[in-house]
Amino acid sequence: YNGQTYVDTMSKEAIAEFIRITHERYFETVGDEFGKSIPTIFTDEPQIFMMETLKFAEDKSEIRVPWTTDFPETFKETYGFDLTEKLPEIFWDKQNGEISFARYAYHDHTCERFAEAFFDQCGKWCKEHNIVLTGHVMEEPNLFSQTHALGEAMRTYRGFELPGIDMLCNSVELSTAKQAQSASHQYGREGVLSELYGVTNWTFDFRGHKFQGDWQAALGVTERVHHLSWYSMKGSAKRDYPASISYQSPWYKNYSYVEDHFARISTALTRGVPDVNVAVIHPIESYW
């Protein structure tokens, strides 16, 4: 974090100050174009904290878990008991396989504080200023990664007007796209955004671009944010997560072959109403 620390994303006060020194400055400078030539604000990989665990029961290592100043007070208001009296249950399993409600409640409250402080506040500000909040959270793919960094991904999507995902390294993460699409449907949003093609290298050809875009479109992605177009590739920039979808790539003038295809698909996907008759229970809370 450039020699500093990460912001406390569970603190409403901290995020309100973040909005004041960033979003408000954007509004002062280019607010007349909000909702016009500047349709969205993109947030990239917000997270709580990379939660750590002991490697074994008698491990003496120092580990870190998400916390904020008034966490014990808001926890007690929500669940009716003092978490500090149950702290060992966050780190160690109970005997005889007994499930710890305190551990579940800790993860639940951590995620809710995160969603309220960051996404609810940022989303509210964006609505009040006629601009769409979009972007994606950190570590979306599976139950472990979400618990590790977020609590859960789907709860955070409520603050987005356009929920998004990130697909790096030519990965295929079906549940990542599907849970974002599901949240978009449930919250009444118009589509799903994907940041895609990051870390695919200079050799990634149009077949790869089409494949990645096709399977994501099939799972509900309607808006594409390309990673990325460089201003310059001087110095070490030329090794910074290529390729550049711009003049640095010899094929950039032919890229319309790819984008014309997805423009037609997106048009079709955004002109209908989802007809969903199957419900799948997301097991993230059971994982906690």
At which residue positions do the language-model features occur?
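Catalytic and substrate-binding clefts that recognize carbohydrates or anionic sugar/phosphate headgroups
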Residues: 1-32
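Carbohydrate-binding surfaces of carbohydrate-active enzymes
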Residues: 28-40, 45-288
